[in-house]
Each structure stands twice: as structure tokens, then as C-alpha cells.
């Protein structure tokens, strides 16, 4: 089963082929049950980002994937400093209801710490996309 995480009133996903799951329901989902989890721009609006990522990783079945997209703080800063983004636009991106904002490198590091293999990472404009896979138990020798 494939699920897409959404945050009611803040961020709604528009994805076909996914069952849509409210962010607050993550704890009630079965562990190791999902072949794909899609998280688009929700992490910035969560107070306990690391705990939430850890919980998501538990929900991925072996050989399953997680796709995470979000705003990259370095790219936003770079655009502001090069005057491609006004201060007002920057403030809107950084502070409009967000608890935190990170970079693609921060999220990749966290996913790797949790034992996932990074299959793809990309930054386009201010948004990053990461695809990571949960390896089978015997694929990650210690």
C-alpha cells in the first residue's frame, strides 16, 4: 500500500494512487506495512521533526521507499542573498507557520542514521526531494 501524508488546513497532497493519511494518524498505523510513503512539505510544520521521521521510517516495509520533499534553507538563503528573492518572500517561506526548516543534507543524514539507503536526492529552486529505501535486514551488514 502507498500512503501520502497531509497536514489538514496547512498542506493537502494532490497525489493519485496513494491513500491519504492525516499527519496526526501516523502513530496508529501498522509498522513495516507500507511499500511507499510520500511526505510533501509537512516536515517544516512539525515540532518534533526527528521523532516524526523516526516514526515514519518504522512504517516502511523492507524494500519499501519513502519520498520526502521540503524547502531547503540553504537555497532560500542563497536566493535572498543574490536578490532573486525579496526579504518579504523569504520571510513568508521561512516563517509562515513553520516550526523549523532544514536542508536536503540534514534530512539525508537523518535518514541514513535510521538505516535507510538514499536512492535519489535533488534540489530544484528552493525545494528538495529525497527518495530512500529501507533495506532488507540482511542487506545492511554491521
What label would you give each PLM region?
Residues 1-22:
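Short, hydrophobic beta-strand segments that form beta-sheet elements in well-ordered domains
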Residues 15-18, 33-35, 63, 115:
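Short, well-ordered alpha-helix to beta-strand connector turns
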Residues 19, 38, 67:
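Conserved Rossmann-like nucleotide-binding pocket used by diverse enzymes
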Residues 26-40:
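A short acidic, Gly/Pro-enriched loop at the edge of an enzyme's catalytic core
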Residues 41, 55-56:
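Non-membrane alpha-helical segments in proteins
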Residues 41-49:
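Di-metal (Zn2+ and/or Mg2+/Mn2+) metal-binding site signature of metallo-dependent hydrolases
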Residues 46-47, 60-62:
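Helix-to-beta-strand junctions that scaffold the AdoMet/dcAdoMet cofactor pocket
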Residues 50, 55, 65-142:
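S-adenosyl-L-methionine-dependent methyltransferase catalytic module, highlighting the catalytic core
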Amino acid at each position: 500500500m502507498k500512503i501520502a501524508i497531509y497536514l489538514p488546513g496547512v498542506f493537502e497532497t494532490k497525489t493519485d494512487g496513494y491513500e491519504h493519511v492525516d499527519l496526526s494518524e501516523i502513530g496508529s498505523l501498522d509498522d513495516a506495512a507500507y511499500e511507499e510513503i510520500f511526505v510533501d512539505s509537512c516536515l517544516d510544520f512539525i515540532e518534533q521533526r526527528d521523532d516524526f521521521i523516526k516514526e515514519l521510517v518504522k512504517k516502511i516495509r523492507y524494500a519499501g521507499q519513502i519520498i520526502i520533499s521540503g524547502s531547503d534553507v540553504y537555497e532560500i538563503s542563497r536566493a535572498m542573498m543574490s536578490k532573486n528573492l525579496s526579504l518579504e518572500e523569504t520571510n513568508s517561506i521561512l516563517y509562515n507557520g513553520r516550526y523549523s526548516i532544514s536542508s536536503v543534507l540534514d534530512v539525508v543524514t537523518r535518514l541514513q542514521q535510521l538505516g535507510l539507503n538514499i536512492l535519489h536526492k535533488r534540489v530544484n529552486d528552493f525545494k528538495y526531494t529525497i527518495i530512500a529505501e529501507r533495506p532488507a535486514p540482511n542487506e545492511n551488514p554491521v
